[in-house]
Regions:
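Residues within mature, well-folded domains
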Residues: 20-135
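Sec-dependent signal peptide recognition
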Residues: 2-10
Length: 135
């Protein structure tokens, strides 16, 4: 009986570890804070976006489901030409944030991640943002 329990436990551990997405290792990055700061209303995304921007290459090997595991569900997504998908994560100035300054859609700070037709992340861009970590 104990042998069966050991085998079942081992199988469950292997299954669990194979289903989780490995987070990109970035010093100072708090993924939980990013996910819980919807639309950037608490300002935590503004503190973290520079780390994502400077480490873009670490986010370019993931598919859409893996990006959702890492950064949470995007606040907006668009289907683009040739079956490309674009995820948008808002950083600042979104109307969903009550009591804060808002701006028009094209003036908001937001993270854009583009996926190709094969569901691979191909580019990452932060709109209306100058990264203080880049020189």
């Amino acid at each position: 009986m104990m042998k069966i329990f050991t085998y079942i436990s081992l199988i469950l551990m292997i299954f669990q570890s194979s289903c989780s997405t490995k987070l990109p290792e970035i010093e100072g990055m708090n993924y939980d804070a990013w996910v819980t700061d919807k639309y950037g209303c608490r300002g935590e995304r503004m503190d973290l976006v520079s780390l994502i921007d400077i480490n873009q290459d670490k986010f370019l090997r993931y598919n859409q489901n893996e990006i959702i595991d890492i950064l949470g569900r995007p606040e907006n997504q668009t289907l683009f030409t040739r079956s490309q998908t674009i995820f948008y994560y808002y950083i600042s100035y979104n109307p969903a944030c009550n009591g804060q300054e808002t701006r028009m859609e094209d003036e908001q700070i937001k993270l854009e991640i583009r996926f190709d037709a094969l569901n691979r992340s191909k580019s990452l861009y932060v709109h209306n943002y100058v990264n203080p970590l880049k020189k």
